[in-house]
Amino acid sequence: MSSSTDARRQEVLRAIVADYIASQSPVGSKALLERYQLGVSSATIRNDMAVLEAEGLIAQEHASSGRVPTQKGYRQFVDTLHDVKPLSKAERRAMLTFLEGGVDLEDVLRRSVQLLAQVTKQAAVVQLPNLKVSRVKHCEVVALSPVRLLLVLITDNGRVDQRNVELDDVIDPEQTHRLRDILNTALEGKTLTEASVELAALVDDSPADIRPHLLKAATTLIETLVEQPSDRLIMAGTSNLTRVALTEGLPSIIEALEEQVVVLKLLARVPDLGNVSVSIGEENEADELRQTSVVATRYGFGTGSEAAALGGLGVVGPTYMDYSGTISKVSAVARYVSEILAGE
């Protein structure tokens, strides 16, 4: 078979997938001839469709209907995508403006899933950074009153945790300043596990006049560090799944998405920063998600050998999703989140 014949059949497959994504209706040779510039006769298109069907790339749902893509057909379509739909300047500007409105890391990530759900019309998920690899960047101590402190713990990946501390005795501004210095000297640059150990050993060596205050602050900070789960997810847009043809298995799909382990496995399939993973139908390990497709990537810092992924984000939708547009939007949101975290 000539390479030109193979290329033409790929174009026929691409046209069938594109038409079905747009209409969710079986596609016939007449529709392909009318809507796409394939440059061949209806008989040639019918012959190509017969070959594609024999190869398992398309299927006929009913004897009198046109053809629909199979999961194998979607996979070949995705694997041969040469270009994804570029975002317009207005879309890029609107996305970045919305994300930059986040007040801290969690707010930025919450906005990212809301944005992804809105622009892709799919269910969106994002994984908060794994705190096992986080390090303390700074600990701020603010006196809210003479007997009440606000502790603000900031990690190197932008995570911010705030806790109030009720003191047993009055603390003056000079003591507050010293308390801040002691905590930062002990904690800055430490992993969260190391920080907990440092805090536990800190009190005995502290000046007597601030020891009670330091004990209260250290206890609160240790509780904060211990409370943090290693993986957390934020989800948005599950209602979008009710608008697509997933009604038969919708309850089990939503239940699977609410199982964090299932979603974390999906996000873990992305090898590194800058890559987008597409899992189609049966490629998903969870049985409940085998009529869906998952488009996922990672966000983090740096590029190349200096890259450090902090977590994953992506969308879950029907197998007939707009792959080109979805890949572009997932990639863009991850890139903008990474830029915001890097302070660019």
Swiss-Prot record:
Gene3D superfamilies: 3.30.450.40, Heat-inducible transcription repressor hrca homolog, domain 3, Winged helix-like DNA-binding domain superfamily/Winged helix DNA-binding domain. Keywords: Repressor, Stress response, Transcription, Transcription regulation. SUPFAM superfamilies: GAF domain-like, Winged helix' DNA-binding domain. GO terms for molecular function: DNA binding; DNA-binding transcription factor activity. It comes from the Bacteria. It holds the Pfam family HTH_DeoR. One of its GO terms (biological process) is negative regulation of DNA-templated transcription. Belongs to the HrcA family. Negative regulator of class I heat shock genes (grpE-dnaK-dnaJ and groELS operons). Prevents heat-shock induction of these operons. PANTHER family: HEAT-INDUCIBLE TRANSCRIPTION REPRESSOR HRCA. This is Heat-inducible transcription repressor HrcA. It comes from Corynebacterium aurimucosum (strain ATCC 700975 / DSM 44827 / CIP 107346 / CN-1).
